[in-house]
Amino acid sequence: GGDLEIGADVFTGNCAACHAGGANSVEPLKTLNKEDVTKYLDGGLSIEAITSQVRNGKGAMPAWSDRLDDEEIDGVVAYVFKNINEGW
């Protein structure tokens, strides 16, 4: 798993503009809560599916693979997965 401290920093610096507190400011129905992620994310709620979404983007969400390194992506995925499962 990724480093949660790195993940928290990456989330705050890159993701929170749209996803603060697990929300989605661009597409309000597609939040980062467990029910929505399970329903809307390609592949459902899994580390692999979240990693793919972060790396490749989809819809309004940009791909981050050219801006974040593997350690940063693994960290932010671990951070998001933990928070989804704990209800932010």
Curated annotation (Swiss-Prot):
GO annotation terms (biological process): photosynthesis
Keywords annotated in UniProt: Chloroplast, Electron transport, Heme, Iron, Metal-binding, Photosynthesis, Plastid, Thylakoid, Transport
Protein name: Cytochrome c6
Location in or out of the cell: Plastid, Chloroplast thylakoid lumen
Alphabetical list of Gene3D superfamilies matching this protein: Cytochrome c-like domain (1.10.760.10)
Family per similarity comment: Belongs to the cytochrome c family. PetJ subfamily.
PTM: Binds 1 heme c group covalently per subunit.
Binding site for heme c: C15, C18, H19, M61
Subunit structure: Monomer.
Source species of the chain: Bryopsis maxima
MF-aspect GO terms: electron transfer activity; heme binding; iron ion binding
Biological function: Functions as an electron carrier between membrane-bound cytochrome b6-f and photosystem I in oxygenic photosynthesis.
Recorded GO CC terms: chloroplast thylakoid lumen
